[in-house]
Amino acid sequence: MASKSQVPYEDRARDHPNPLARRLFQIATEKQSNVAVSADVTTTKELLDLADRLGPYMVVLKTHIDILADFSAETITGLQSLSQKHNFLIFEDRKFVDIGNTVQKQYHGGALHISEWAHIVNATVLPGPGIIDALAQVASAPDFPHASDRGLLILATMTSKGSLATGQYTELSVELARKYKGFVLGFVASRSLEGVETAGKADDEDFVLFTTGVNLASKGDALGQQYQTPESAIGGGADFIISGRGIYAAPDPVDAARRYQKAGWDAYLKRVGR
């Protein structure tokens, strides 16, 4: 798979065929940031407080909305307001993994109404092509008002030790991304997918790569998480770095967000030769 990692964000913002990807790279260029904060807190107050304090330094806020003990409509209106105030996108890390009929209901209905507020969601291709088709159908429905502002990341590899998301699984991830490129922004992966080759490559192909498990200080945790530094992640092909505990659990989360912003941006400038 071809990589556009050497191309500056502003050029990708101008040329990208996907409108949400264009917006993502525009925000990154304006804020000089490639940081996505994974705010794995358990109350609405904590989540909105972090989003407000860290908003100026991040491009994306990644949520696990189902771990909130007090989720309500106020949670969503608060997130939407802060997204507009600080110009960041919301990524609900739902990791859809079920049959198509079920994931459509999880995405577009249920208690969480994810399609109404999350710009980005993610899914695994373990159930086969039907899961991507089902999610894409929701976003392309004639009566869905947010079509140009919604996108999917496919979970192509994982940072947990012993992950089975390798080989044929990763190849299928790339194949389905190419098939549904109008809806699929790119991948969540621990490394560049440049060496993964499948049919269907297009000249304007430019999939966005998010890398999780980015931490300036730690090598991992007791539950199998394996960390990378911002420099190693960006140098390895990541367009955006996702950090959770390294930022929100720091003694001063704002200072931590600034440090990750600088480290990630410096690594990006080095990658594009600036």
From Swiss-Prot:
Disulfide bonds: none annotated. Substrate binds at residues 40, 62-64, 93-102, 227, 245. GO terms for biological process: 'de novo' pyrimidine nucleobase biosynthetic process; 'de novo' UMP biosynthetic process. The active site is at residue 95. Pathway: Pyrimidine metabolism; UMP biosynthesis via de novo pathway; UMP from orotate: step 2/2. It catalyses: orotidine 5'-phosphate + H(+) = UMP + CO2. InterPro entries: Aldolase_TIM, OMPdecase, OMPdecase_AS, OMPdeCOase_dom, RibuloseP-bd_barrel. Keywords: Decarboxylase, Lyase, Pyrimidine biosynthesis. The keyword Lyase applies. The keyword Lyase applies. GO terms for cellular component: cytosol. GO terms for molecular function: orotidine-5'-phosphate decarboxylase activity. SMART domains: OMPdecase. Its EC number is 4.1.1.23. SUPFAM superfamilies: Ribulose-phoshate binding barrel. Pfam families: OMPdecase (PF00215). CDD domains: OMP_decarboxylase_like. PANTHER family: OROTIDINE 5'-PHOSPHATE DECARBOXYLASE. Belongs to the OMP decarboxylase family. This is Orotidine 5'-phosphate decarboxylase.
